[in-house]
């Protein structure tokens, strides 16, 4: 059975929401905790790096859990729904840090940021893994994947274009308050978009998934030189994207400087985001 336009649209809406959440964390968490709350750059960077190493083990472990899941609602939708609710709560907590002394804030950031990564993986892995289970048609699977990737880019672009505008509009002179409001808005939109996605998608194709242990996955990876090249390329590409998204705001604030740095930053974002591939 071919997918309907309604299902493809709902899947794309889900991608918009989940990548709005990802982009907000990836692009602004360092700025929020370093420049707004005053933690040291070295500590924030250390936590971000530790989280990426943790993800290397968390992602395949999550894949194993999803593969072993059996429920009346299917294998994937329960994880997408529960992961979305938890991640929305954690995202808000990430950008609504309470007033704490430096040591307590360091602990708070470390715990909440790791939890954000875990809960995001809870919904992201099953979101993409669901594609083969909702249609048997190879063309539909390719189209659904393309819709998801395209709409994910829309979600990222929305965050890049409007976050700092909303921070200023909602928080006034307080960036701390502005980020809290933005996180609340994005969290609510995230839940709504994933509810739309879960309501429209149905697992119509039995997808028996052979599971391997995390140890077996890494063992197979290290024995395959071609897979290592692909993984290495992905790491380099994602590192470049992550560094750019995190540090471009610092370039405008400290290198270009001046009272109008936000206007210059937003001008570039509004020009570049709609034209990127």
List each language-model region with its residue ranges.
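Short "domain-exit" segments at the C-terminal end of structured domains
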Residues: 273-277
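Membrane-embedded alpha-helical bundles of multi-pass transporters/translocases
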Residues: 2-268, 272
């Amino acid at each position: 059975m071919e997918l309907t336009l309604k299902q493809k649209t709902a899947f794309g809406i889900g991608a918009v929401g989940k990548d709005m959440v990802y982009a907000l964390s990836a692009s602004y968490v360092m700025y929020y905790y370093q420049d707004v709350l005053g933690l040291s750059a070295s500590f924030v960077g250390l936590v971000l790096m530790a989280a990426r190493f943790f993800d290397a083990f968390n992602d395949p472990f999550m894949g194993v859990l999803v593969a072993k899941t059996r429920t009346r609602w299917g294998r994937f939708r329960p994880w997408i729904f529960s992961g979305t609710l938890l991640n929305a709560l954690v995202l808000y907590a990430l950008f609504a840090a309470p007033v704490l002394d430096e040591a307590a804030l360091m602990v708070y950031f470390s715990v909440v940021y790791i939890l954000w990564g875990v809960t995001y993986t809870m919904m992201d892995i099953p979101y993409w893994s669901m594609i083969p289970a909702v249609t048997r048609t190879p063309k539909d699977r390719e189209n659904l994947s393309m819709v998801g990737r395209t709409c994910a880019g829309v979600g990222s672009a929305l965050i890049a274009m409007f976050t700092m505008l909303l921070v200023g509009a909602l928080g006034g002179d307080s960036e701390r308050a502005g980020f809290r409001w933005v996180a609340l808005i994005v969290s609510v939109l995230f839940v709504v978009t994933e509810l739309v996605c879960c309501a429209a998608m149905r697992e119509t194709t039995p997808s028996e998934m052979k599971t391997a242990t995390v140890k077996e996955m890494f063992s197979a990876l290290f024995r395959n030189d071609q897979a290592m090249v692909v993984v290495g390329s992905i790491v380099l590409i994602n590192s470049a994207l992550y560094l750019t998204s995190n540090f471009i705001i610092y370039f405008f604030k400290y290198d270009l400087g001046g009272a109008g740095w936000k206007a210059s930053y937003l001008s570039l974002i509004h020009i570049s985001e709609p034209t990127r591939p």
